[in-house]
């Protein structure tokens, strides 16, 4: 088991698949726009250190529009329009914990409290959803989740949609809580995402395990 994300990345950097993956991403950046930026690609690790993780929210692909993705799943930069899936997440947060929707989509405050907001693909070409999913990110994500499965404290995995549920199939440690549900996208949210109460369920589990609950309110300081 690693002790920091830096240690984890150093370990991966020696592996042939990762060397090939970084080469492919680098070549794609030379040919066009790739999101998020190189410095933000692993920002979920920077904002949520390994020893602070409490919750994992697993997304699929970074946003592929200019200025949106900054390395946290579902999150966008502060001055960018809130995407539809995140609007639905805010609606459920209001219904679940009576927290008013934020006027921005920047989720760094969650990350800083121990919410690891990670995607299964960590880069994407502009305007091409899923364009990097076959570059080797699945192996990288599997290795991240393997580390988290062996984590020494109980974690909550919030898995929205079949893609996330399937990606986290290796999370088998009984001390963790898996909250599986429908994706918050406008196409699916009304089929069971609304009313699923993932935020209160997460905090109840954390309290039961003597871990500080998450303050989900993005409006408070």
From Swiss-Prot:
Transmembrane segments: none annotated. It catalyses: Hydrolyzes single-stranded DNA or mismatched double-stranded DNA and polynucleotides, releasing free uracil. Its main location: cytoplasm. Its EC number is 3.2.2.27. It comes from the Bacteria. The active site is at residue 61. One of its GO terms (biological process) is base-excision repair, AP site formation via deaminated base removal. GO terms for molecular function: uracil DNA N-glycosylase activity. Coiled coil: none annotated. It is an enzyme of class 3 (hydrolase). PROSITE patterns: U_DNA_GLYCOSYLASE. Signal peptide: none annotated. Keywords: Cytoplasm, DNA damage, DNA repair, Hydrolase. GO terms for cellular component: cytoplasm. Belongs to the uracil-DNA glycosylase (UDG) superfamily. UNG family. Excises uracil residues from the DNA which can arise as a result of misincorporation of dUMP residues by DNA polymerase or due to deamination of cytosine. This is Uracil-DNA glycosylase 1. It comes from Listeria innocua serovar 6a (strain ATCC BAA-680 / CLIP 11262).
């Amino acid at each position: 088991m690693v002790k920091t994300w830096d240690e984890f990345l150093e370990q991966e950097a020696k592996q042939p698949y990762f060397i090939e993956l970084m080469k492919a991403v680098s070549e794609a950046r030379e040919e066009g726009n790739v999101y998020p930026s190189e410095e933000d690609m692993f920002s979920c690790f920077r904002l949520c250190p390994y020893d602070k993780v409490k919750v994992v929210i697993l997304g699929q692909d970074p946003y592929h529009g200019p200025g949106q993705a900054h390395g946290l799943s579902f999150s966008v930069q502060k001055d960018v329009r809130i995407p539809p899936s995140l609007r639905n997440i805010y609606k459920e947060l209001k219904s679940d914990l009576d927290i008013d929707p934020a006027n921005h989509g920047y989720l760094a405050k969650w990350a800083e409290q121990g919410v690891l907001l990670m995607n299964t693909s960590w880069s994407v070409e502009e305007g091409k959803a899923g364009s990097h999913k076959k570059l080797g990110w699945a192996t990288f994500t599997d290795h991240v989740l393997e580390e988290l499965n062996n984590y020494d404290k109980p974690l909550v995995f919030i898995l929205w949609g079949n893609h996330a549920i399937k990606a986290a199939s290796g999370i088998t440690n009984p001390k963790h809580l898996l909250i599986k549900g429908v994706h918050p996208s406008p196409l699916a949210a009304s089929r069971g995402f609304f009313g699923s109460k993932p935020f209160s369920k997460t905090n109840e589990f954390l309290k039961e395990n003597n871990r500080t609950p998450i303050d989900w309110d993005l409006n408070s300081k």
